[in-house]
């Protein structure tokens, strides 16, 4: 195996070509990739990172649409690296995209990350050579990079999805996908704005547009069962009070299902009286954030009656905020549209109140579907509505889209699209049979979409780094997932998924938002602590489930 050493700054300047073979090439400069870069470099690996964007931050580099912000409270939406949290102060409890960029730039300065990153480097293809046991990675406008191992940290939102609507190319106004928003911003003041989609970005954009746009029309297929954010501005004194509590909060992240510092209640909703249930639900509601979703009764995502209790409480709270009963029925129907919590809820600040404004209209596309787009606007069965700006808040080809968008080829000439055509198969959510020496973080069949991003970045990052150290210490130059092991991993996920209420919601969690995509759990839904335990079980047995060769 090639000796692993650290390259100098002169050898790997920012945006310079990589002129030597690497031990590890990292793809993606979000929380996960940067964490691995920092620690692998400290451990003496010859490592470099490439990213398609012009700056670090991953999703927070690309997402700068109006209202874009974190849906996790700032205390745990950060690295647990002491030199960062001890010095950085947050301005809001739920930071917006601009604050997140400030945080990443602060981390870059403190940890000296950019010297080992090539920006504006979008990976197009990669081919594995069995003879050299190396990947050759190609991107437009750059020299090929050779690396013993590649770790792709592409996130679950790397591949935006825009619906195929007839006539979009004829529209004379502006149109954008929220994930590809112009970095210079877009002025919505005084404009007629259409927002297609009511996922998290749709909710956030709608709130902001309603403040000063002339007219806002929200096209909704499924209502977002959003929760109150309870935003708060933070002073220097607030930050000072928070800091002593952070180490314990970081420690709790690895012990809670979704990598937060709170977890489900060890009580069943069906076993409590109505008064007891209401008291608990009221407390969760008033706490704000995701507690109503992820600190609720332990049975509500598995038992339909328990789920009804949770939904009905939410419904009644929301309907009280909406003046028009017909609009209330579309936004918070008397009968739940799907099990509550089976789709990721957005956190909102004044979303439901905007529909009481004269300049905001809600269109249910189940009743009046979008037929086409014209040069002036959008046509439904009720006629044409004219717009100056169309916003596609239509989400992503989530979780797998980042990997399938790159033409990774093994020495049988297969791509991820080929081997996953009948469903995802991975071992521990980090590798797929047929692709030796290619690992991925925050990817398919990992906690990813069910986990706080920084928690996943650190815990899974540590597990991958321990794996890399094992390979180095034992002179192993080739690792590949075993087919039998990944079948067992996939069955574990499928069995749990099918025992829950999640399959009853058409969601990106199972790929049902993308036409033609196989419907299956894209993530590991058994929780972060179980994931860590399963990974460690493999490690204790010399990484059982992988084929290793010197």
Curated annotation (Swiss-Prot):
GO terms for molecular function: cyclopentanone monooxygenase activity; flavin adenine dinucleotide binding; N,N-dimethylaniline monooxygenase activity; NADP binding. FAD binds at residues 31-32, 51, 60, 71, 77, 123. Pfam families: FMO-like (PF00743). Catalyzes a Baeyer-Villiger oxidation reaction, i.e. the insertion of an oxygen atom into a carbon-carbon bond adjacent to a carbonyl, which converts ketones to esters or lactones using NADPH as an electron donor. Converts cyclopentanone to 5-valerolactone, a step in the degradation pathway of cyclopentanol. Besides cycloalkanones, can also act on methylated and other alkylated cycloalkanones, and on methylated cycloalkenones, with high enantioselectivity in some cases. Cannot use NADH instead of NADPH. Its cofactor is FAD. Belongs to the FAD-binding monooxygenase family. InterPro entries: FAD-binding_Monooxygenases, FAD/NAD-bd_sf, Flavin_mOase-like. It is an enzyme of class 1 (oxidoreductase). This is Cyclopentanone 1,2-monooxygenase. Pathway: Alcohol metabolism; cyclopentanol degradation; 5-valerolactone from cyclopentanol: step 2/2. One of its GO terms (biological process) is cyclopentanol catabolic process. The record marks 344 as: Transition state stabilizer. Keywords: FAD, Flavoprotein, Monooxygenase, NADP, Oxidoreductase. Homotetramer. Disruption phenotype: Cells lacking this gene are not capable of growth on cyclopentanol or cyclopentanone as a sole carbon and energy source. Signal peptide: none annotated. The keyword Nucleotidyltransferase does not apply. It catalyses: cyclopentanone + NADPH + O2 + H(+) = 5-valerolactone + NADP(+) + H2O. Its EC number is 1.14.13.16.
């Amino acid at each position: 195996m090639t000796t692993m050493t650290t390259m100098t700054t002169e050898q790997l300047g920012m945006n310079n070509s990589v002129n030597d073979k690497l031990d590890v090439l990292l793809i993606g400069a979000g929380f996960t990739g940067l964490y691995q870069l920092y620690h692998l470099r400290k451990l003496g690996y010859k490592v470099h990172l490439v990213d398609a964007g012009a700056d670090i931050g991953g999703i927070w580099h690309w997402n700068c649409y109006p209202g874009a912000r974190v849906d996790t409270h700032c205390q745990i939406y950060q690295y647990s690296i002491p030199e960062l949290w001890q010095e950085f102060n947050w301005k809001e409890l739920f930071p917006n995209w601009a604050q997140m960029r400030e945080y990443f730039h602060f981390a870059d300065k403190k940890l000296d990350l950019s010297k080992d990153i090539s920006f504006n480097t979008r990976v197009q293809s990669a081919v594995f050579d069995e003879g050299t046991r190396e990947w050759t990675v190609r991107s437009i406008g750059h020299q090929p990079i050779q690396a013993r191992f590649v770790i792709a940290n592409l996130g679950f939102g790397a591949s935006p999805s825009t619906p195929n609507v007839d006539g979009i190319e004829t529209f004379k106004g502006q149109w954008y996908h929220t994930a590809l928003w112009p970095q210079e911003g877009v002025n919505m003041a005084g404009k007629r704005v259409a927002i297609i989609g009511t996922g998290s970005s749709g909710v956030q954009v709608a709130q902001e547009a309603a403040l000063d746009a002339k007219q806002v029309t929200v096209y909704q297929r499924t209502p977002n069962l959003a929760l109150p954010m309870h935003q708060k501005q933070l002073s220097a004194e607030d930050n000072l009070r928070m800091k002593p509590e952070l180490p314990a909060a970081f420690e709790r992240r690895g012990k809670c299902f979704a990598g937060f510092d709170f977890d489900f209640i060890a009580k069943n909703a069906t076993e409590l009286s109505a008064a007891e249930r209401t008291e608990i639900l009221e407390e969760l509601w008033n706490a704000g954030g995701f507690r109503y979703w992820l600190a609720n009764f332990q049975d509500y995502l598995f038992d339909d009656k328990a789920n009804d209790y949770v939904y009905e409480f939410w419904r009644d709270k929301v309907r009280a905020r909406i003046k028009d009963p017909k609009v209330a029925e579309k936004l918070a129907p008397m009968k739940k549209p799907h099990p509550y919590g089976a789709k990721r809820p957005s956190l909102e600040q004044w979303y439901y109140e905007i529909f009481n404004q004269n300049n905001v209209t809600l269109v249910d596309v189940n009743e009046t579907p979008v037929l086409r787009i014209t040069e002036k606007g959008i046509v439904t069965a009720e006629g044409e509505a004219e717009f100056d700006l169309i916003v596609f808040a239509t989400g992503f080809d989530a979780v797998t889209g980042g990997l399938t968008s790159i033409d990774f080829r093994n020495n049988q000439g297969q791509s991820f699209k080929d081997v996953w055509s009948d469903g995802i198969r991975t071992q521990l959510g980090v590798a797929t049979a047929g692709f030796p020496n290619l690992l991925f973080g925050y990817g398919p069949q990992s906690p990813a979409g069910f986990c706080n991003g920084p928690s996943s970045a650190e815990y899974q990052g540590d597990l991958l780094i321990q794996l890399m150290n094992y390979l180095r210490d034992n002179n192993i130059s080739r690792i590949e997932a075993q087919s039998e092991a990944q079948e067992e991993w996939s069955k574990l996920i499928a069995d749990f998924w099918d025992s829950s209420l999640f399959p009853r919601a058409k969601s990106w969690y199972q790929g049902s938002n993308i036409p033609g995509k196989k419907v299956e759990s894209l993530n590991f839904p058994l929780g972060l602590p179980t994931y860590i335990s399963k990974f460690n079980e493999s490690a204790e047995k010399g990484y059982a489930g992988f084929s290793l060769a010197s």
